[in-house]
Amino acid sequence: MADHPEPPLTRIQQKNRDLILQGALSVFSVNGFRGATIDQIAEAAGLSKPNVLYYFASKDDIHKSLLTTLLDMWLAPMIRIDPGGDPLEEVMAYVRAKLDMSRRYPRESRLFAYEILQGEPHLTEILGGRLRNIVDRAAAILQGWMDDGHLAAIEPRHLIFSIWALTQHYADFDVQVRAVLGPGHDPFDEAGPFLDNLFRKMLGV
């Protein structure tokens, strides 16, 4: 007998699921996977523990679902790189999108960094396939532009790594950045023109 697809979630079910994932983000970003409990997640979500377990069978399931959701969000700007667009402007649009994500989603960025440093198996499993495939696609687009003389020739994957490092730093090390800059500085407003200038000089031909 063929499997039947699960019916779509109702509006209330989707709302509760989102509340659980937001609560899980708060808990995991402070305590990590090992230190987090279902009770803490339920409290952060404003739901009962049985209600949480209605939507997710275990802490494992919540963690995997949260990381998958974060990865989807994290990869979206890279997927939007258009091979038919202006090469330098496509790269700069990606840099701006990544910096904007660091501004708007600092907890998500820090959780991702924390889980990578901890070597969480869920993240290794998720990253090993989809992330590599999307990076391979972006690297192939960049390499094509370089081969055609539209961008300076550098190793495309390390270019991608440098974009990640130079944008996510402002979320992952926010306290350090603000302490060094001192009062009256907006790190993101100042980082935007700096990164634009840096990558244009690096890639311009």
Annotate each language-model stretch with its function.
Residues P7, K64-A93, V135-G144:
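Amphipathic alpha-helical linker/stalk segments
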Residues L19, G23, V27-D61, S65:
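Helix-turn-helix
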Residues A2-H4, D100, R104, R132, ...:
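C-terminal peripheral helix-coil segments that are non-catalytic and often amphipathic
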Residues V95-K98, F112-E115, I163, T167, ...:
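Short alpha-helical scaffolding segments that buttress acidic/His motifs in well-ordered protein cores
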Residues I79-E108, P156-I163, G192:
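Hydrophobic alpha-helical connector segments
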Residues E89, E125-R130, M146-S162, E190:
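All-alpha amphipathic helical-bundle segments outside canonical DNA-binding/catalytic cores
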Residues M1-K15:
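N-terminal intrinsically disordered/low-complexity leader segments
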Residues R103-E125, F173-L181:
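Amphipathic alpha-helical segments used for helix-helix packing
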